[in-house]
């Protein structure tokens, strides 16, 4: 039931890291909410269609590229400005997280190495990694398993309001779903 609100909160946090926290006006936050709801509604429609068609293929989760395309299609000037700011992270040199992940999430022990990422990508990468980790926590919870999470470089989340809120909620959610977080 919290799937879409949690995903939209992640999009807000990720976009704040990209465009700057001071740019996150109520209009920007509302646009992110609208586009996020639209994007995940389309995803849920694809899921339902896959069930009806008896398809064994699950639709892929939306990517930041999908979010960017929908944002760019909005009529408001603020949406156009946000899309321009996001462009480097979708089509440009910082497009590390714009596509489906190449990390094998079926391993029991997963390490995300961020050492070689540009400094401008560190905060954003930590948020993307936590979102991926959260999906694993949910999967393990459904199987009755605990998930142990070690977060190095925790201080990176403390540099912005959205980062602080995201990590706080992440830790609280993990505890409710048998996640054990060590900082």
Regions found by a protein language model. Give the residues of each.
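P-loop NTPase motor domains
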Residues: 1-179
